[in-house]
Structures are given as structure tokens and as C-alpha cells.
């Protein structure tokens, strides 16, 4: 028999969201565990920045090529994250 009480009893989650999260079970897909060694972390950071730079360069080249071949100027659309609250059709009063 055990000597004394258990220190940490299993408790039910207080909120519904936490209870649902717990009962959902394991998620699909693989897990990505980051490296511990500083040198490998640095290499991955460098690799990521190079990949981003290369991708931006390729996108820029494609846009320049497309805009030079079109008779009308090519308009680029940026993400909708810049619009914060203000709707384009209405003016504040």
C-alpha cells in the first residue's frame, strides 16, 4: 500500500475549450522538433533567409517580365492585412 496521499491529483479542465482540446486526442501530421545545437540553429536561420531572398528575387523577375510584355501597366495587389477597420466605400462622419 502507498504511504500517504498523492501530491497532484488529476483535475478536470475548468473551461470547455480546454476540455475539448484534451479529449480531441493526438493531432495528424508529423512533429517538427527544432535543433538544440547553436550551429545548426544558425545554419537553419541562414538557409531560411536565403530561401526567402531567392523566392522574392524570382517573384520580382516574373513580375518585371510580365509587366514588360504587357501593353498596359501591371497593377500588383498586396495582402488585405493593411486595411484595419476602415471600409473603402464609407467615409467616417
Curated annotation (Swiss-Prot):
It comes from the Eukaryota. Residues 1-41 are annotated as: Disordered. InterPro entries: UPF0390 (IPR019034). Residues 7-18 have a biased composition (Low complexity). Leydig cell tumor, testis and placenta. Residues 25-39 have a biased composition (Basic residues). PANTHER family: LEYDIG CELL TUMOR 10 KDA PROTEIN HOMOLOG (PTHR16967:SF1). Belongs to the UPF0390 family. May have a potential role in hypercalcemia of malignancy. This is Leydig cell tumor 10 kDa protein. It comes from Rattus norvegicus (Rat). The lineage of its organism: Eukaryota, Metazoa, Chordata, Craniata, Vertebrata.
Amino acid at each position: 500500500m502507498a504511504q500517504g496521499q498523492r501530491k497532484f491529483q488529476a483535475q478536470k479542465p475548468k473551461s470547455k475549450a480546454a476540455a475539448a482540446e484534451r479529449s480531441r486526442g493526438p493531432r495528424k501530421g508529423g512533429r517538427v522538433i527544432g535543433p538544440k545545437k547553436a550551429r545548426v540553429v544558425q545554419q537553419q536561420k541562414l538557409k531560411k533567409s536565403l530561401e526567402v531572398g531567392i523566392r522574392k528575387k524570382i517573384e520580382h523577375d516574373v513580375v518585371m517580365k510580365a509587366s514588360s510584355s504587357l501593353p498596359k501597366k501591371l497593377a500588383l495587389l498586396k495582402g488585405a492585412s493593411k486595411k484595419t477597420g476602415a471600409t473603402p466605400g464609407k467615409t467616417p462622419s
